[in-house]
Design a protein with these regions (language model features):
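Short, structured helix-loop boundary elements
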Residues: 38, 45-46, 66, 88, ...
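Alpha-helical DNA-contacting segments of helix-turn-helix folds
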Residues: 91-98, 137, 141
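Short hydrophobic/aromatic patch on the recognition helix
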Residues: 74-84
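Short linear capping/connector segments at secondary-structure termini
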Residues: 107-111, 142-151
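Basic, helix-initiating cap at the start of DNA-binding domains
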Residues: 1-59, 63-72, 89-92
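Hydrophobic alpha-helical connector segments
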Residues: 93, 107-136
Length: 223
């Protein structure tokens, strides 16, 4: 039987961060690596994730505990905590497939989000596309980014978004592409977006337009 080489998942763990690339088509998709897993471990993982997704949808993410997930999945607490050390780890795992969908659109989808548009236009399209993604699962992304200090920067998905933004900014000739990528992604943090949408009651479409304009400003080349 193949050895179970998977470890516990949490929002503070590194999740297959993309390697440095030189071409947009080389950007790796999160989660494409082959991971060997025992059949019983795989079944338990699927049961846990299905239970977590169901409970999060029914009660909201803050209203669900790890004990609730273990009970709903029919697994022992030890089994749950060996694989997912906290709710942040559950959030990261649940988001994986959804994030890969957006990543695939970036890699091979139609322009302006995918290849074929000018770099500045692609950057603005990424902002709009990511905001739409974020709006659909804001609580999950918020949990995955804030469950432990620095959790957001350690996820493979964040590494992918940063590499993509940095690449496009480099292509536009913008100065300090690393810093500008970080500035743009800081505005797209789930906690910040939640504040704008739920505390300040900003309209999502208006916010997308404003942040896309900010992306275009960041993409301006050296004078």
């Amino acid at each position: 039987m193949p050895e179970d080489v998977t470890g516990p998942e949490s929002a503070s763990s590194t999740v297959r961060s993309p390697e440095p690339v030189t071409c947009r088509t080389q950007l790796p998709v999160l989660g494409v690596g082959v991971v060997r897993e025992r059949a019983d471990a795989a079944r338990n993982r699927l049961r846990v994730l299905a239970a977590a997704e169901r409970l999060f949808a029914q009660r909201g993410v803050p209203g669900v505990t790890m004990d609730d997930v273990a009970a709903a999945a029919g697994v022992g607490k030890g089994t749950l905590y060996r694989r997912f050390v906290d709710k942040g780890g559950l959030a990261v795992a649940l988001l994986d497939e959804r994030e890969r969908d957006l990543q695939q659109q970036i890699l091979t989808g139609p322009p302006p989000l995918g290849p074929g548009a000018d770099p500045a236009g692609r950057l603005a399209a990424f902002v709009a596309g990511y905001l739409a993604f974020l709006d659909r699962q804001l609580d999950l992304v918020l949990l995955s980014e804030t469950s432990t200090p620095g959790a957001r920067q350690r996820t493979g998905a964040h590494g992918f978004w940063r590499q993509h933004c940095r690449y496009l900014l480099t292509q536009t000739g913008a100065p300090n592409p690393d810093l500008r990528a970080d500035l743009l992604l800081a505005a797209l943090a789930a906690e910040q977006v939640r504040h704008w949408l739920h505390d300040e009651h900003r309209d999502l479409d208006d916010l997308a337009d404003e942040l896309s304009a900010a992306a275009l400003a960041l993409a301006k080349p050296h004078p």
